[in-house]
Amino acid sequence: MHIVLFKPTPYNVRKNTQFKALIADTWELVLDIPAEESPPFGRVEFIKFAVRPTKRQIRQCKRYFRKIVKLEKQFVTCDYAEILK
């Protein structure tokens, strides 16, 4: 799992000052699981925070993300099992 926490810079997007202020106040957490095989494909999740997230918030997001991925794999295998019958 790859984890990236960053604060995006507004200067590459637009020149509007309101938009710059809106972007400058947010933090983004990117959680990524690369593709193991096809299917299932890899998954990327972007989570926005108003302030810098704490380590606890990041751990909670990681747990939630792992649960989602595990559930998706179950759904994918169930669907393929029905198709192959």
Curated annotation (Swiss-Prot):
UniProt cross-references to InterPro entries, sorted A to Z: DUF7279
Highest taxon in the source lineage: Viruses
Protein name from the UniProt record: Uncharacterized 10.2 kDa protein in sp-Gp41 intergenic region
